[in-house]
Amino acid sequence: MFAIIKTSGRQLKVEKDQTIFVEKIDKNEGETITFTDILFINGKIGTPYVENASVTGIIEKQGKAKKIVVYRHNPKSTHKRKLGHRQLFTKVKITELKG
């Protein structure tokens, strides 16, 4: 059994006991989170969401992804710009699919 949830502007296919990485959610590690924007579960397709359906998970970790380097250079001048970015993420383990 699987479900398709919508979180942080993305759609994710999830199953029970699966670990997913989503954009940062303001909760502490060990807390329970419930996703209510369910697009598909048990063969039911939502319009746009399935009613009375939810996916529950436990937050395992809050962290930062690896650094990416953004480098911009204008070849007609000596202008250069180098920036780094580390995206915040939340690691969630799916514990229950209801619906």
Swiss-Prot record:
Coiled coil region boundaries: none
Statement: the UniProt record of this protein carries the keyword RNA-binding: yes
UniProt entry keywords in alphabetical sequence: Ribonucleoprotein, Ribosomal protein, RNA-binding, rRNA-binding
UniProt key word rRNA-binding: yes
GO cellular component: cytoplasm; ribonucleoprotein complex; ribosome
GO MF annotation list: rRNA binding; structural constituent of ribosome
InterPro entries membership: bL21-like, bL21-like_sf, Ribosomal_bL21
Superkingdom classification of source: Bacteria
Stored SUPFAM superfamilies: L21p-like
One biological process term in Gene Ontology: translation
Pfam families: Ribosomal_L21p
Function noted in UniProt: This protein binds to 23S rRNA in the presence of protein L20.
UniProt record similarity statement: Belongs to the bacterial ribosomal protein bL21 family.
Quaternary context: Part of the 50S ribosomal subunit. Contacts protein L20.
UniProt-recorded name of the protein: Large ribosomal subunit protein bL21
